[in-house]
């Protein structure tokens, strides 16, 4: 017969009471009223914050964007096909953030920082908010170091500095992405981390860019963030902020970074789609009223850090596509007013075989000249003005039948200057090579040559100087100035080489 001992029972009850944990978890929940087109309307979620992540019953994550009196408008980070009306939603208490680490270098990721290159997970111990405030005035210093693109037309006449924001703008198929990718290729060995953000691009175009980076050995210092044309609007809207968060991680670790947004007008279209579906009032070109803020808060994150913060930098190169050269459209004017200058690419120049098709007359760099090395300033100082005058003169010369000798000479010089600015894709030039090239053209050494011979001669001259006059490169790279000694070396070498070249061409 079982005997019940009262003291044992009382001990068990006492233990249970001591172990009882009165922990209460409060979850902010709501119910799905309506779902479709990447948008969900939620009843409840009374204490949700603007921009807070919410989780649906079947696992989809969304962002609370519209906080209205009787419901919450949520944009979905997925297709939302499994979300049902009446299912529950809970607030997570978190704002969108991504993991960050050095391990992201060389990888292709999506807007949520998940790898999409099939090479396994990326380990990261830290995380950063996707949207973090831009550095304040005290945290910055003025731009003073050059970011060399390797493109002679840009580095000589529209220079970009580390920490600058320079817009690349032009019609479709004018080589905008090529300018940006060449800039990334030229950062090899320059200790610059590059982030390329593809927003709403064709998957084949992104694959082509990644292949170029891999072939040229640029992936080891590059991160590619890609949300292709078939991605949900929410992810296309988030992708640039994800790229900026990754670049900021390196900037605040005293590194130099360069970020390319290709292109923010696609992000604006995704944001317009989300806003219209959330029934926000449309404005000009049906964009919402805060589309300027969409881009300004993104591009203001590019900065040159102060010496107290380690002098890291983040250079932004947004790419904007225009429709038949119309730069007065809404998004182009917005981005032009936010950035520190713009590089215009012209379809007419591109079709005329001038590539990169940079329209030097209307391209500007508002702060880059402070970053240009002294040697380049000395040599290329007058080039931009000369080319602008040449373009004007060329237009005038079409109507004039007989031109005087001085005008003919100026036209011939201008044609040769324009010829030396032509450059094939993925063939960046060092600063020293650029200085030699411009000096040769600006001082009339190319005048005896036919226009078709210019490119061939310049290649020959650069090769000769590298092998026979290595001290020239050493002088420019060590002093950063174009000294009398450097000029004397060139004055000696160029006429010799021209004579030799002309003899070779005759035989």
UniProtKB/Swiss-Prot annotation:
Going by the entry's taxonomy, the superkingdom of the source organism is recorded as: Eukaryota
Instruction: Write out the entry's keywords from A to Z.
Output: ATP synthesis, ATP-binding, CF(1), Chloroplast, Hydrogen ion transport, Ion transport, Membrane, Nucleotide-binding, Plastid, Thylakoid, Translocase, Transport
Q: Where are the residues marked Required for activity as a site? A: 363
Main location class: plastid
| Enzyme Commission number(s) | 7.1.2.2
Q: Which InterPro entries match?
A: ATP_synth_asu-like_sf, ATP_synth_asu_C, ATP_synth_asu_C_sf, ATP_synth_F1_a_nt-bd_dom, ATP_synth_F1_asu, ATPase_a/bsu_AS, ATPase_F1/V1/A1_a/bsu_N, ATPase_F1/V1/A1_a/bsu_N_sf
Class of enzymatic activity (EC top level)? translocase
Name its cellular compartments.
Answer: Plastid, Chloroplast thylakoid membrane
Q: Write down the membrane topology.
A: Peripheral membrane protein
Which Pfam family is an annotated match for this chain, by its short name? Answer: ATP-synt_ab_N
**Annotated signal peptide:** none
Q: Which reaction does it catalyse?
A: ATP + H2O + 4 H(+)(in) = ADP + phosphate + 5 H(+)(out)
What are the record's GO terms for cellular component? chloroplast thylakoid membrane; proton-transporting ATP synthase complex
Disulphide bridges, residue numbers: none
Question: What does the entry list as the binding residues for ATP?
Answer: 170-177
Q: Name one GO molecular function term.
A: ADP binding
Q: Which family does it belong to?
A: Belongs to the ATPase alpha/beta chains family.
Cited HAMAP family: ATP_synth_alpha_bact (MF_01346)
**Function description:** Produces ATP from ADP in the presence of a proton gradient across the membrane. The alpha chain is a regulatory subunit.
Could you give the subunit structure recorded for this chain? F-type ATPases have 2 components, CF(1) - the catalytic core - and CF(0) - the membrane proton channel. CF(1) has five subunits: alpha(3), beta(3), gamma(1), delta(1), epsilon(1). CF(0) has four main subunits: a, b, b' and c.
**What is this protein called in UniProt?**
ATP synthase subunit alpha, chloroplastic
Annotated source species: Liriodendron tulipifera (Tuliptree)
Gene name linked to the record: atpA
């Amino acid at each position: 017969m079982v005997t019940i001992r009262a003291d044992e029972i009382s001990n068990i009850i006492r233990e249970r009471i001591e172990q009882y944990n009165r922990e209460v978890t409060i979850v902010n929940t709501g119910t799905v009223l309506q779902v479709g087109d990447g948008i969900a309307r939620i009843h409840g979620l009374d204490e949700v914050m603007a921009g807070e992540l919410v989780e649906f019953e079947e696992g989809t994550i969304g962002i609370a964007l519209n906080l209205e009196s009787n419901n919450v408008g949520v944009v979905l980070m997925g297709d939302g096909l499994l979300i049902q009306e009446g299912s529950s939603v809970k607030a997570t208490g978190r704002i969108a953030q991504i993991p960050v680490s050095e391990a992201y270098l060389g990888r292709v990721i999506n807007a949520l920082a998940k790898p999409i290159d099939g090479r396994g997970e990326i380990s990261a111990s830290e995380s950063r908010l996707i949207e973090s405030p831009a550095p304040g005035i005290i945290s910055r210093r003025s731009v003073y170091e050059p970011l060399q693109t390797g493109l002679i037309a840009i580095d000589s006449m529209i220079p970009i500095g580390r920490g600058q924001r320079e817009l690349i703008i032009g019609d479709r198929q004018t080589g905008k992405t090529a300018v940006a990718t060449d800039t990334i290729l030229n950062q090899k060995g320059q200790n610059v981390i590059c982030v390329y953000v593809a927003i709403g691009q064709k998957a084949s175009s992104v694959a082509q860019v990644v292949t170029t980076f891999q072939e040229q050995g640029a992936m080891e210092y590059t991160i590619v963030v890609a949300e292709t044309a078939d991605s949900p609007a929410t992810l296309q809207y988030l992708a640039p902020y994800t790229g900026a968060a990754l670049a900021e991680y390196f900037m605040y670790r005293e590194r130099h970074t360069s970020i390319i947004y290709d292109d923010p007008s696609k992000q604006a279209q995704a944001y317009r789609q989300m806003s219209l579906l959330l029934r926000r009032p449309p404005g000009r070109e049906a964009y919402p009223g805060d589309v300027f803020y969409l881009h300004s808060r993104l591009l203001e994150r590019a900065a040159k850090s102060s010496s107290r913060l380690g002098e890291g930098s983040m250079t932004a190169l947004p790419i904007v596509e225009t429709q038949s050269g119309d730069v007065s459209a809404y998004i182009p004017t917005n981005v032009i007013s936010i950035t520190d200058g713009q590089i215009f690419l012209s379809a007419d120049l591109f079709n005329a075989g001038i590539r990169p098709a940079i329209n030097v007359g209307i391209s500007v760099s508002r702060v880059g000249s402070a970053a240009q090395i002294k040697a380049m300033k000395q040599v290329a100082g007058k080039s931009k003005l000369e080319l602008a005058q040449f373009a004007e003169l060329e237009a005038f010369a079409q109507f004039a039948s007989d031109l005087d000798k001085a005008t003919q000479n100026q036209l011939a010089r201008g044609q040769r200057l324009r010829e030396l600015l032509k450059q094939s894709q993925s063939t960046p030039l060092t600063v020293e090579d650029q200085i030699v090239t411009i000096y040769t053209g600006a001082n009339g050494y190319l005048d005896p040559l036919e226009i078709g011979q210019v490119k061939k001669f310049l290649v020959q001259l650069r090769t000769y100087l590298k092998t026979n006059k290595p001290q020239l490169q050493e002088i420019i790279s060590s002093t950063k100035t174009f000294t009398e000694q450097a000029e004397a070396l060139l004055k000696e070498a160029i006429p010799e080489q021209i004579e030799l070249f002309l003899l070779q061409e005759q035989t």
